[in-house]
Design a protein with these regions (language model features):
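Conserved AdoMet
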Residues: 30-107
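Non-catalytic accessory regions of SAM-dependent methyltransferases
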Residues: 1-34, 39-41, 46-49
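Residue-level signal for inorganic ion chemistry
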Residues: 29, 67, 97, 128, ...
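Mobile active-site "lid"/loop adjacent to the S-adenosyl-L-methionine
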Residues: 202-231
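Conserved Class I SAM-dependent methyltransferase catalytic core
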Residues: 227-290
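Active-site beta-alpha loop architecture of Rossmann-like, nucleotide-cofactor-dependent enzymes
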Residues: 71, 203-206, 257
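Conserved SAM/SAH cofactor-binding pocket of Class I
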Residues: 98-209
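Conserved hydrophobic residues forming the short capping helix/wall of the S-adenosyl-L-methionine
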Residues: 14, 108, 158, 240, ...
Length: 295
C-alpha cells in the first residue's frame, strides 16, 4: 500500500470513531511510526509502505479509535518545548499547566530570586519540576509523588532532560512527610523553602462521572479532588504553609470554575496578595499567593 492511501484509510478510521482531532492525530502517528511528516506526504505520497510498518500503524490507529490517548500511544509529549515520557499510570502534561510554570517563573524573575528552593507537589511526569529547574538552573527543586505507577516516569523524565531534581516519594497530605522533609536541615527547626507549586487532583465527583473516554484512561489518583474538587487545596494550603518562608509563594493550577473558591481558601489559610490568573482560552487557571508573616 502506498503512503497517501494508508493516510486516507487511517484518517477515515479516526473520523468514523469520533476522534475530533483526527487529522492532527493521523499526522502524529505517521510521523512517529513511519517517519513521514507533511512534507514527506506531499513529495513522496506514492512511496510503498512495508507491510510490517503498515501493520504497526494500523495497530496504533485501532488503539486510538478505542479511546487510548494519543500521548500514551506515542509514549512522549512535549511540555514547555521539552520532551516528557508518558504512559498509562501518569497524567498527561497539558498546555494549561504551562501557564502555572510561566507565572511562577515570572514571580521569581520579578523578585530577583534566581536560586529559590521549590517543592512541586503531585509531580506526576515531573513536567513542572523539570521545567522550573531548567529555567532556573540555580534553584533547588524537589518533586513529590505518591504513585508507584507515576514514579518511573518522573525519574525517567528527570534523566531525559538532565535536570537535577530531587525526588521524594510520599503523600502530600501526610504531615509526617513534611516533618521528615523539614528535618533534613538538622537545625532543630522547620526547614523553610521559597515556594510550593502544585497541579493537584481537582476534578469533582460529578466531573469524574462525565469524563471523556480518553481522560478516563488517565489515573484517577491524579484527577479526583474530592466531592467539590477542593480537597487538596485545603490540605496543602494548611500543611505546607509550615515550611514556607514568610513571603514564600504558593501556586496552584485550578479547574476553570475554582478561582474564587481556591482564592478564598488561601486567604483564610494565612496567605496574602492572592491573585487568580487566566489561561490562553480566558479561563481561570492559576491561583497564587504569598505567606503572611507569622505574628
Amino acid at each position: 500500500m502506498i503512503l497517501k492511501d494508508l493516510y486516507e484509510i487511517t484518517e477515515n478510521m479516526l473520523l468514523a470513531a469520533g476522534v475530533e482531532s483526527h487529522k492532527f492525530d493521523t499526522d502524529c502517528l505517521f510521523e512517529d511510526i513511519l517517519g513521514a511528516d507533511r512534507v514527506t506526504m506531499t513529495l513522496h505520497g506514492d512511496r510503498e509502505v512495508p507491510e510490517k510498518d503498515a501493520d504497526r500503524l494500523m495497530s496504533a490507529a485501532e488503539k486510538r479509535c478505542c479511546g487510548k490517548p494519543l500521548q500514551y500511544i506515542l509514549g512522549r509529549w512535549e511540555f514547555f518545548g521539552r520532551p516528557f515520557c508518558v504512559g498509562e499510570g501518569v497524567l498527561i502534561p497539558r498546555p494549561d499547566t504551562e501557564v502555572l510554570v510561566e507565572k511562577v517563573l515570572e514571580h521569581f524573575k520579578n523578585s530577583g530570586n534566581f536560586s529559590p528552593e521549590i517543592c512541586d507537589l503531585c509531580s506526576g511526569t515531573g513536567c513542572i519540576a523539570v521545567t522550573l529547574k531548567k529555567e532556573l538552573p540555580k534553584a533547588i527543586v524537589h518533586a513529590v509523588e505518591l504513585s508507584s505507577e507515576a514514579m518511573p516516569y518522573l525519574i525517567k523524565n528527570i534523566r531525559l532532560n538532565e535536570a537535577d531534581v530531587k525526588v521524594i516519594k510520599g503523600d502530600v497530605t501526610d504531615s509526617l512527610l513534611i516533618e521528615n522533609f523539614a528535618d533534613m536541615d538538622d537545625i532543630g527547626e522547620y526547614r523553610k523553602i521559597d515556594a510550593v507549586v502544585s497541579n493537584p487532583p481537582y476534578l469533582t465527583d460529578k466531573e469524574m462521572e462525565e469524563l471523556s473516554k480518553e481522560v478516563k484512561c488517565e489515573p484517577e489518583l491524579a484527577l479526583r479532588g474530592g466531592a467539590d474538587g477542593l480537597k487538596f487545596y485545603r490540605i496543602i494550603a494548611c500543611l505546607w504553609r509550615e515550611i514556607l518562608r514568610d513571603g514564600g509563594l504558593i501556586a496552584f493550577e485550578i479547574g476553570w470554575e475554582q478561582g474564587g473558591a481556591v482564592k478564598d481558601i488561601l486567604e483564610k489559610s494565612g496567605y496574602e496578595n492572592v491573585s487568580v490568573y487566566k489561561d490562553y482560552a480566558g479561563n481561570d487557571r492559576v491561583v497564587m499567593g504569598t505567606k503572611k508573616a507569622d505574628v
